[in-house]
Amino acid sequence: MKESQVFLERDRSRQQDFLYPLIFREYVYGLAYSHDLNRSTFVENVGYDNDNKYSLLIVKRLITRMYQQNHLIISANDSNKNPFLGYNKNFYSKIISEGFAIVVEIPFFLQFSSSLEEAEIIKSYKNLRSIHSIFPFLEDKFPHLNYVSDIRIPYPIHLEILVQILRYWVKDAPFFHLLRLFLYNFCNRNSWITPKKSISTFSKSNPRLFLFLYNFYVCEYESIFLFLRKKSSHLRFKSFSVFFERIFFYAKREHLVEVFAKDFSSTLTLFKDPLIHYVRYQGKSILASKNAPLLMNKWKHYFIHLWECFFDVWSQPGTIHIKQLSEHSFYLLGYFSNVRLNRSVVRSQMLQNTFLIEIVSKKLDIIVPIIPIIRSLAKAKFCNVLGHPISKAVWADSSDFDIIDRFLRICRNLSHYYNGSSKKKSLYRIKYILRLSCIKTLACKHKSTVRAFLKRSGSEELLEEFFTEEEEILSLIFPRASATLHKFNGNRIWYLDILLSNDLVNHE
């Protein structure tokens, strides 16, 4: 997005009203393609001709066709015959959808950058982007709380809801007409899919555009939640996030106050809770409080009414779970967390009398969920459902170096991500499964048994990197503490360079 800021900084004041002409600019599609290359997720269109890859010639041909209005006329019965957006030739549709995401992100990226500069957190923004930056906050705040609500944000059933939310921010009618054109064309092509699965299929075919629309849906409901939170509390509210000032928010806020004054007049008076914390990642959020569970039930009913009445999204009964932190754990970002009581006895002596004082302190215990990870490893064919390592037969055609490098990369990523666990035993078991799966894969490639392969190759020299890798990383971080590296193995280490979670971590 840095390139987009260079291109559009000169016209910054008018971009919000004139997004439609940007779809006809070649550099927009170049930005979309370079972004995919940087993320290493650009998919060559399987099932199409070799010419259906990104090139400047294809983009110019696409822009020329977009100027011809007859190519944009679509009917539900004519999708297969349409040369521009047909089911069999939808490569242009894919390119334009990627360009849509770039164009609609531009004004909000500029607003977000200016908001960071005004808040003077631009220097620490890179650290705040890390997934692990959430856990120090949890360790500091959650031991003092008693109850937690585990909330799963429901998806909008219809894509039109996402478009309507975006219309409150950007006022460009032609742009949204064309956006609806693509969304309805997608629904017509997948009419055999149920509405609930349709949005899931759309998220896979157009991930960038879908994530942008979905994030706006989440930001919309969070902005209303934050408004009511500040309205109900007389204390000063501090937020760890940067929220934009919405165009349509104040008119909607008056309507909300009117509605909640009728239906929740007695509820709002009970919402004064100075110790309430809200954390969200992707489609899951955590709401924690120190007060009685009655307040948490009030917030639960508030969320359900907000989703169903304001966003027309049906919320299932099991969407929100209220738990007591001292008795139950909650799942977030691949970890199981709960508040554990630490008891210690202190001996105190006064003159000739000796007293034993028991001190009870609370500590947030963050552990690795071994069973979900074993399920993920079994799904990826590294082990069976019981956790017994098996050979990765798909990789048997690769060279020995590539096989070992792949296993080491996965082991390194998991070890890097789960190094914040307070108990390392589960992490060592995961590394053992990957190590033995690597050995079995190499033995399968050479058509020999595991014992014969290790005897011929030498197990210590072949896979010693599985054991030395973590110590090498710690020696780089703490170069003067090499003699006490084993001390850090039992402690938590949170890394501020983790921007994405591994696929094996996403168990849900």
Swiss-Prot record:
GO terms for molecular function: RNA binding. Keywords: Chloroplast, mRNA processing, Plastid, RNA-binding, tRNA processing. The keyword tRNA processing applies. It comes from the Eukaryota. GO terms for biological process: mRNA processing; RNA splicing; tRNA processing. It holds the Pfam family MatK_N. InterPro entries: Domain_X (IPR024937), Maturase_MatK (IPR002866), Maturase_MatK_N (IPR024942). It is found in: Plastid, Chloroplast. GO terms for cellular component: chloroplast. Usually encoded in the trnK tRNA gene intron. Probably assists in splicing its own and other chloroplast group II introns. Belongs to the intron maturase 2 family. MatK subfamily. This is Maturase K. It comes from Astragalus sinicus.
